[in-house]
Regions:
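Accessory alpha/beta interaction modules
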Residues: 1-128
Length: 130
């Protein structure tokens, strides 16, 4: 963190790490899910955490990814706006589904059911004026 006359700058990756740290436990993640979706689920074990951590392909990593109620939820925390977040989310979902689907099943005649993806980005300011 650096400080100037009237402002404090916080390292972007520190905020990102804090977001992941707070919601890495299923109980807290379920609470966030309920707040975002207006639901009242109580069993945190219904969550299946599937967050990508430094996947080999493109060195991708996302903040939070989990399956709940047949939805694949990808939650990202950003300190600045990025118009490329939808594309990044597409890459994340593709990489996650590659891991969940047996490659041989792609060539069979039966439909492979996948969870419906939901993307959510939490933004905050990168500069705090005091």
């Amino acid at each position: 963190m650096t400080e100037t006359k009237n402002e404090i700058r916080v390292a972007k990756n520190h905020k990102d790490r804090l977001f992941r740290m707070i919601f890495r436990e299923k109980k807290e993640l379920l609470s966030l899910y309920n707040a975002v979706n207006g639901t009242s689920y109580t069993n945190a074990e219904d969550l299946e955490i599937v967050t990508l951590e430094n996947a080999i392909y493109m060195n991708m990593k996302n903040d939070l990814a989990f399956i709940m109620d047949s939805y694949l939820n990808l939650y990202e925390h950003q300190s600045t706006y990025s118009p490329n977040m939808p594309l990044r989310d597409l890459f994340y979902i593709a990489k996650e589904l590659q891991g969940q689907v047996n490659h041989r099943d792609l060539y069979r005649n039966t439909l492979i059911k996948i969870p419906t993806p939901r993307f959510l980005v939490f933004y905050n300011l990168s500069l705090i004026h005091i």
